[in-house]
Amino acid sequence: MSAILSADDLNDFISPGVACIKPPAENVNRDTNNENGEVDIQIDNEGNPIEISRLDGTATSLSAAQISLADCLACSGCITSAEEILVAQHSHNELIKALKEKVQNKTDKVFVASISHQSRASLATAYNLTVEEVDRLLINLFINQMGFSYIVGTSLGRKLSLIYESQNIISKKEEKFEGPTLSSICPGWVLYAEKTHPYVLPRISDVKSPQQITGCLLKTLTARDLNTTRDNIYHLSIMPCFDKKLESARPEKGEPESAPNDVDCVLTAKELITLLDEHSDDFSLFPPQVESILSASLVSTTELYTKCAPKNWPFVDLSWSNDNGSSSGGYAYHYIKLAQEHLILKDPSTYQPENFTLKTISGRNSDIYELRLIYKDATVASAAIVNGFRNIQNLVRKLKPSTKQTSTVKANPLASRRRARLASKTDGTASSNNATQDTADASKCDYVEIMACPNGCINGGGQINPPADVPEKEWLTKASENYTNIPSYDLLSAGSNGNMLSELIEWCQEFCKEFDLNQNRLLKTWFHEVEQSTDPNAILLGAKW
């Protein structure tokens, strides 16, 4: 486990497996005829492995087996991720290496960046600044010091993700999909499901996260703007979570393995600080001209947002804006609001806006709660927020398919009567009863917004830790306040041609048409069960501590 990411960062962290069971890939450059015949493996005087031919004594150096992020996605050795691989392949050192290679080799490599809302809030908390001030400093850092061509917020990608996620759930609800649809925005949760609870995969939404949608948009628009190719663009994404590194390596369905990723490197706010500390002679968040950088009287923040984005980047006024709801993006909240809008538009004679109410139902702890959209006395839509692995485990257990009992075990009469009493309380019309229940039950909702970190993405493992003299709760509260203070932009607010919702949908369709891009390539991902290893040696090693 890396020094940057440790179990101390999360209070209900699930430790990774000891053994990585992914077999090393065959070296395609080696001679498949094995001209050396039988060989012995030895260690030379410098500690390097060498291969000695028994035929003529020829010594051949052996290279270390390499494990990629794509390998981690296909490996069941760890429950969520292998941190050493994450940090090694998506590290600030790799970014610095890429920047130096551009200068040394005099290439025309293009560097672009996107940054999440939570990371901006974390940096603002660490430096006691406003998020707007942090934005101005980051733009100066990446554009003026590091030589990036563009930097954007992830708001456009997030808003498209929110829209199509909500539409997906509404469609499933109308198709009588049984049980909740589960969000896929958190890669830690998704990897956990793929490797340990594959029976929930049919429930997981296939709508991409803001990181991946932003990556596709940014590379596509940058390529046209600068007359270059996608594989000549290096996209850095600043995220609150280390598992976002693995998400960036998930291959696109139907594309060759050699196809360039939409995101080339993911760094957390914590890693960005490490980069600045280690390369303080080259880069600084607070250069000598910091006062002029922070002064909005010279250049407004909106002008800065426009200048640092590709020329054809749309909706610049909302590209760094926030969204209502939870600090993980507000997915549950937006489903409820768009479900209400859908009902009103679909049947205006039945549903009047003034008769809707939104009720929040608390769960067993602060990391579980439910949002219910009530029309008069009936629940017409529901969504839950479930944060933290402990709560996730409880949810997936409830969603596990029941198996018919084949043995003739005598039933416990007390247990039977207790189940009967519980059933009598929940029988009847779900709509009317759900409106009056006062305990959140995510397993019975239309949709569940799931995040692996307690308190959601604002408390991601890659966020900056508090100083020793500041309580964690106080630090998290301040970060949450900074996040909330980012100006939000309601999807249902008025736009130039109707509301922002319809304008975004229309723009997305035109974007895909203009670039001959299948909409699924932009918006959809895929998941699959990661089968457990049958290699007894790997299983044995993984059982040892």
From Swiss-Prot:
Ranges for region Disordered: 401-438
Keyword Translocase: no
UniProt source species: Debaryomyces hansenii (strain ATCC 36239 / CBS 767 / BCRC 21394 / JCM 1990 / NBRC 0083 / IGC 2968) (Yeast)
One term of GO molecular function: metal ion binding
Protein purpose: Component of the cytosolic Fe/S protein assembly machinery. Required for maturation of extramitochondrial Fe/S proteins. May play a role in the transfer of pre-assembled Fe/S clusters to target apoproteins.
Residues annotated for [4Fe-4S] cluster 1 binding in this entry: C20, C72, C75, C78
Cellular component GO terms held in the UniProt record: cytosol; membrane
Classification lineage: Eukaryota, Fungi, Dikarya, Ascomycota, Saccharomycotina
Superkingdom as given in the UniProt entry: Eukaryota
Stated name of the protein: Cytosolic Fe-S cluster assembly factor NAR1
Keyword Magnesium: no
